[in-house]
Amino acid sequence: MGEKMKSLDKMIKERLYAEVYEVLATDNFVYSYENLQKAFPKADSMQYYCFLMYSISKEETPEKHLAVCNLLAFGEPLLDDIYTLINWHINRTLSLFPAFTPIKSFAVYIFFHCPVSPISEGLLYEYALSVLQENPDDSLSKELIDEFESKK
């Protein structure tokens, strides 16, 4: 790991989010959960979450919301009711960026067949239809659509 990344890793652990944000902005950092893990391998989920929320407060993008959703779904547990937070980020993203299909695909992946899904089957069906328009080979969206339509 280069000295710059070691320094950033230390800064994020010290909660110097503004400084980290500025460095990443000048480097045209691409926000994703995977890229955060690579950039800050020693950070924990709470540090990622706090940094992402700071970053969203500076510039709200759908990619940052998707990174938060992936963190909440696949990172170490932060809270008891993560589905509520994930749903909030999905709704927020789609209210600002309605054509952002990756978050719809994420919702289908996480909440299809989830017994405690905060998203209705009807809305997941709409998301799946949208995903298929962009990615006709998405097998999970096809499965959701077939299952939903067979119940009609």
Regions found by a protein language model. Give the residues of each.
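Boundary/linker segments of alpha-helical solenoid repeat arrays
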Residues: 2, 29-36, 95-103, 133-144
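Terminal, low-structured helical/coil segments at or just beyond the last alpha-helical repeat
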Residues: 123-152
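Terminal domain-start segments
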Residues: 1-51
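Short coil/turn connectors between adjacent alpha-helices in alpha-solenoid helical repeat scaffolds
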Residues: 33-42, 73-84, 111-123
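Well-ordered, non-transmembrane segments within structured domains
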Residues: 64-93
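Alpha-helical repeat scaffolds
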Residues: 14-23, 46-57, 82-94, 119-132
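Amphipathic alpha-helical repeat scaffolds of TPR domains
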Residues: 18-37, 58-75, 99-113
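Alpha-solenoid repeat scaffolds
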Residues: 46, 62, 78-82, 100, ...
